[in-house]
């Protein structure tokens, strides 16, 4: 079976990451893959970098009319305004297996076009572990914005929200800016914040903890929770008693909410910033059900409508690793590479076979629902 990949240009605003990097393209080409890469005005990688790695650069959006045998590779979901049937095989994060808003329409496009979806979120090894994830950099970037928002509140009035953010050249540039913002807050008399991280033992949580440490917080300031600490079920008063709460869990089944408005709407609440890295905003089982807006880089926070206590904001950006697009892309693509090399045997390779079967199960679920 052939393996011809077509990397489409991302269309989500501020999405500068890529599922394939010039580094991984070079390896794939050396193994006999044919790679097409669309020109992209927002990718952190230049078209010339891909060309030098052996890819053929093609026009933006040309995947729509590409031969059917090409596998279309991307990261984020396709534009909502597109409704035409999907006839290609796609590798991407589709966000349609957990009853997210619009899931029926997304799967319906594949059904009507005869296409196939390999959802990146559900590519798993034999132990059930994801073969590639952006979790570490999602946690790292989320913690950075959480600290920055907390520091902003110490040095600005409640009428001023955290301003727009943009991708950073590298980790050190991000850490330096956030650490400097915290120093300004300390000069104003603020004490170092106490940060509660739920999901602290996972990829995402470890990234969050590492950022906090690099910005000068010590272990006594970082409250690390995981399955053992949340086993009793929420909501948890400890969240309202922290200065910053970072949710890093992977939501795989309904759970009790971690926090609710009853705990937040109190005059003695310390919590100032919630970072919902998981960003299950449209999931009916969102464990942080105190907001309903997915925030973006141009407007990174949304205010929680409390009537008592200090101003409280939520950061719910669903593409946080884009804050460090080059490093996040390189790490993700490197992890994905071994599975990509198995694409010529995708009908028997367990990673791809499981993903195909999962797609078929959800398509059948959609069909059954339509027959009711």
Curated annotation (Swiss-Prot):
Q: Which residues form the signal peptide?
A: none
Q: What is this protein called?
A: Saccharopine dehydrogenase [NAD(+), L-lysine-forming]
InterPro entries assigned: AASS (IPR051168), AlaDH/PNT_N (IPR007886), AlaDH/PNT_NAD(H)-bd (IPR007698), Lys1 (IPR027281), NAD(P)-bd_dom_sf (IPR036291)
- A Pfam family it matches: AlaDh_PNT_N
Q: What class of enzyme is it?
A: oxidoreductase
The major lineage groups are: Eukaryota, Fungi, Dikarya, Ascomycota, Saccharomycotina
Outline what the protein does: Catalyzes the NAD(+)-dependent cleavage of saccharopine to L-lysine and 2-oxoglutarate, the final step in the alpha-aminoadipate (AAA) pathway for lysin biosynthesis.
Annotated metabolic or biological route of this protein? Amino-acid biosynthesis; L-lysine biosynthesis via AAA pathway; L-lysine from L-alpha-aminoadipate (fungal route): step 3/3
């Amino acid at each position: 079976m052939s393996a011809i990949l077509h990397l489409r240009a991302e269309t989500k605003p501020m999405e500068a990451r890529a599922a394939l990097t010039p580094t991984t393209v070079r390896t794939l080409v050396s193994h006999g893959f044919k790679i097409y890469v669309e020109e992209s005005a927002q990718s952190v990688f230049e078209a010339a970098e891909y060309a030098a790695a052996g890819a053929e650069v093609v026009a933006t959006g040309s995947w729509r009319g590409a031969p059917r045998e090409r596998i279309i590779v991307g990261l984020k979901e396709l534009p909502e305004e597109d409704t035409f049937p999907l006839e290609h095989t796609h590798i991407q994060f589709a966000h349609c297996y957990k009853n997210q808003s619009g899931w029926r329409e997304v799967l319906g496009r594949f059904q009507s076009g005869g296409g196939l979806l390999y959802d990146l979120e559900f590519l798993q090894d034999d132990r059930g572990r994801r073969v590639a994830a952006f979790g570490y950099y999602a946690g790292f970037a989320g913690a950075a914005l959480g600290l920055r928002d907390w520091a902003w509140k110490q040095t600005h009035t409640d009428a001023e929200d955290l301003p727009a953010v943009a991708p950073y050249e590298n980790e050190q540039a991000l850490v330096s800016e956030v650490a400097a913002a915290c120093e300004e807050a300390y000069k104003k008399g603020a004490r170092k914040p106490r940060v509660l991280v739920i999901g602290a033992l996972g990829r995402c949580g470890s990234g969050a903890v590492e950022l906090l440490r690099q910005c000068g917080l010590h272990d006594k300031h970082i409250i690390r929770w995981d399955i053992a600490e949340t086993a009793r079920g929420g909501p948890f008063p400890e969240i309202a008693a922290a200065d910053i709460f970072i949710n890093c869990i992977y939501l795989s089944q309904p759970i009790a909410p971690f926090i609710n408005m009853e705990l937040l709407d109190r005059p003695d609440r310390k919590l100032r910033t919630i970072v919902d890295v998981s960003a299950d905003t449209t999931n009916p089982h969102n464990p942080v059900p105190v907001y309903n807006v997915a925030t973006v880089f141009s407007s990174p926070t949304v205010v929680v409508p409390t009537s008592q206590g200090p101003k409280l904001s939520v950061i719910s950006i669903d593409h946080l690793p884009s804050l460090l697009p080059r490093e996040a892309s390189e790490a993700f693509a490197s992890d994905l590479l071994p599975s990509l090399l198995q694409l010529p045997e995708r009908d028997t390779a367990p990673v791809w076979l499981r993903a195909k079967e999962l797609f078929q199960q959800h398509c059948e679920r959609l069909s059954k629902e339509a027959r009711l």
